[in-house]
């Protein structure tokens, strides 16, 4: 059995790490490089950095801090934000990122997924999916440009259909960002993650809702995800990564120590 991964997420805006609730009202929580170094020291398995306004503002993630992070940490990290071309992806990988993640640009141009996979291999192509439960239609729908509240828009895609589409096009991993749960620390959306797990043949990373150590245990056991991503519980030192790993190991979950 492959060990489960713990992945702190750092949302970046204007050169600072920020955190919102349900993708709104972002507040500054710290500086990029010191936070990255802290999580690596605590035992994070990898890190994810989202430049949350890059796509909405028609720009690419700032490479200057990517190289500084690469110099400071010795664990893999993934970078996302406005990546729309092979050359942009190549540059970020050259600056030290191990993986690149695309979200809104893939919705605009799904062929980008297969082109990136052909160039770099599927192992470093991650697809982020911002999924919103629409109570009116009782369905899960994909949203786009979610890093800027004013720019956020609905797409034509139901979440399960988009999950299948991105796999056909060659993604190596999927991060499912459950918008309704984001930042509220009420637990991961086990129901939705389980539905996606059933149709997902690539590694699936749960995102949105972590509030206690038990939430991590539950998402690994019940939704059978490969990794759990979290932000506010780590930023605010509610949960220490080393202590979380000890807890999960004691609960019988295979975890990297």
UniProtKB/Swiss-Prot annotation:
SUPFAM superfamilies: Ribulose-phoshate binding barrel. NCBIfam families: hisF. Heterodimer of HisH and HisF. GO terms for cellular component: cytoplasm. Keywords: Amino-acid biosynthesis, Cytoplasm, Histidine biosynthesis, Lyase. Its EC number is 4.3.2.10. It catalyses: 5-[(5-phospho-1-deoxy-D-ribulos-1-ylimino)methylamino]-1-(5-phospho-beta-D-ribosyl)imidazole-4-carboxamide + L-glutamine = D-erythro-1-(imidazol-4-yl)glycerol 3-phosphate + 5-amino-1-(5-phospho-beta-D-ribosyl)imidazole-4-carboxamide + L-glutamate + H(+). Pathway: Amino-acid biosynthesis; L-histidine biosynthesis; L-histidine from 5-phospho-alpha-D-ribose 1-diphosphate: step 5/9. InterPro entries: Aldolase_TIM, His_biosynth, HisF, IGPS_HisA/HisF, RibuloseP-bd_barrel. IGPS catalyzes the conversion of PRFAR and glutamine to IGP, AICAR and glutamate. The HisF subunit catalyzes the cyclization activity that produces IGP and AICAR from PRFAR using the ammonia provided by the HisH subunit. The gene is hisF. It is found in: Cytoplasm. The keyword Mitochondrion does not apply. The active site is at 11, 130. It is an enzyme of class 4 (lyase). GO terms for biological process: L-histidine biosynthetic process. This is Imidazole glycerol phosphate synthase subunit HisF.
């Amino acid at each position: 059995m492959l060990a489960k991964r713990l992945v702190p997420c750092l949302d970046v805006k204007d050169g600072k790490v920020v955190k919102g609730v349900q993708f709104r009202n972002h507040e500054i929580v710290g500086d990029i490089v010191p936070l990255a170094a802290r999580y690596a020291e605590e035992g994070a398995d990898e890190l994810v950095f989202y430049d949350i306004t890059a796509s909405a503002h028609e720009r690419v993630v700032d490479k200057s801090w990517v190289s500084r992070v690469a110099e400071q940490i010795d664990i893999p990290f993934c970078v996302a934000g406005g990546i729309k071309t092979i050359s942009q992806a190549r540059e970020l990988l050259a600056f030290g990122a191990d993986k690149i993640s695309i979200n809104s640009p893939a919705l605009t141009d799904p062929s980008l997924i297969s082109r990136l996979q052909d160039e770099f291999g599927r192992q470093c192509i991650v697809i982020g999916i911002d999924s919103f439960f629409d109570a009116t239609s009782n369905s899960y729908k994909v949203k786009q440009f979610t890093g800027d509240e004013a720019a956020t828009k609905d797409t034509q895609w139901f979440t399960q259909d988009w999950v299948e589409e991105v796999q056909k096009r060659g993604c190596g991993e999927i991060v499912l960002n459950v918008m309704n749960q984001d930042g509220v620390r009420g637990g991961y959306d086990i129901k939705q993650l389980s539905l996606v797990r059933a149709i997902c043949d690539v590694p699936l990373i749960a995102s949105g809702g972590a509030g206690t150590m038990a939430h991590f245990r539950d998402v690994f056991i019940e939704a059978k995800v490969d990794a759990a991503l979290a932000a506010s519980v780590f930023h605010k030192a509610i949960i220490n990564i080393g202590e979380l790993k000890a807890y999960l190991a004691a609960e019988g979950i295979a975890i990297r120590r």
